[in-house]
Amino acid sequence: MLWSKALSVLSAEFGLRALKKNAAVVTAESCTAGGIANAIAATPGASAWLKGGWVTYQTSQKIDWLGVPEELIASEGVVSEAVAEAMARGALARTPTASHAVATTGVAGPSGGTDDTPVGTDRKSVV
């Protein structure tokens, strides 16, 4: 309940700032599986500034749908700031009505983590 309330407050503040700047937002999500877009959409008035979202849970969708270079994933790792930024830029390029993008990539678990990137690791980008 506390997490839900905090997310609602953050989303409302985010929306107020977006409206003040006449901004429009698109999301690109991996480990959150649409949770960010869902939280934003639950905010009254979100239709004025939320353009939509991309859920790219699998690596292949990051490449195919958002244009994240395979070489970047190979060199930086799929859970990296560089890949999160590439996801955000890809979503923005494919959503011409958006002025900003929010992206996240990570390891949700319960398996799939490594010593370098344990379960619970996430990386975000806003462009």
List the model feature ranges, each with a label.
Residues M1-V127:
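Short alpha-helical segments enriched in small residues
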